Every structure is written in C-alpha cells, then in structure tokens.
Amino acid sequence: MGRYINPFTDWGFKRLFGQEFSKDLLINFLNDLFEGEFQIKDVTFKDKEQLGDTNDLRGCIFDIYCVTDDDKHFIVEMQNRWVPFFVNRSIYYASKAFVAQRKKFDEAGDRTPVLYQFVPVYVVCIMNFMPKEHEVTKFRTDVALREKSSDSMFSDKLRFIYLSLPFFDKSEEECETGFEKWIYVLKYMEVLERLPFTAQKKIFD
C-alpha cells in the first residue's frame, strides 16, 4: 500500500486540487497543462454547485470550479470510471459556467451587447478509464471552436481538454515535461512509496 492519497476518489481529488491550502498544486498543474499558452498566477475557488434555472431543470455540482487572476473560468473534473454521455455532461457543465456569467451581468443591470461579453471557459476532464465513446481515442484530446475549412480559431471562449490516463504509458524515466511528470504522479500516486521528480519539480517536495 502506498503512502499517499488516492486522487481518483472525490475526497482525494478535492483535497489535492480543490482546497485553499493546496491551490498552488492546481495552479502548477494547469500551468504545465497549458505551457506555452498562458501563465496562471492565482485562482479563486467559486461555488461548485450550479442550480437549475427552474424547478424542473437539474443543476450540477462541479469537482472544482475556479477563476484565474486574468478571469479565465476553469472547471476541473475527475472521473474514475466510465459513465454514459460523459462528453455530453462536460458540455453541459460548460454551459452552466456561461449561464453563471450571464447572471452576474443581469444582477449588475447590464444589457446587450455587454451581456454577451463572456470570458473564456475551460473544461479539463481527467479520466481514469478507457473511453467507450468515439470522441476520445487518445491520451490528450484538445477541443476548441474552429472554422472547419481553414481550421482557424473561431472563438477562444470555449475549450475542452480530455486526459484519458489509460492511454498514458510512459515510465518514470521517460517523463520529460512537467505535464508528463504530473500525469505519472496522478496515475500512480495511490501505490507510490515515494514521490518521484522531487529534485526536478519542487512542487512534489
């Protein structure tokens, strides 16, 4: 038995990434995930429970919902086993984050076109199972809004990243980037007797 928490349980994942005392871990993970695109300096955790707009509409509870210092919204989900319509659920979660922005504008009395000046929403799904749906067929699936014929960016307001851990097969020695080291640690944390990479990555000290 390893010495460390199981990040694939609800308690373990939220303790690792979803607490004030551990938010440096979340920031480091996201910065490694988006290396070369942007740098996050701080995050503010938001209410994870999003109620339905009416009594007959179901709400949702995110694993982690936070806003960065430059106002990017992040939903980070851990799914330990396959469930039907997982990709559809992640799209629904993103829509709730946009609705939350709309409510903020409504309460401030703003009107169009300000109402539609959304900030970007990123949904990061860590999947500890082999997908059965055709949408996810490799370790990292990166989805953005693009124009089909030119593949040029249509809008930066919505992004999905699906990380399917069974497709990640690198050994400790083969991990080179900070992101690869994160994935290795997450995948094997429950059975590790010691954390690797502490000499190269101080966040694991």
Protein language model regions, located:
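Elongated, amphipathic alpha-helical interaction scaffolds
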Residues: 1-205
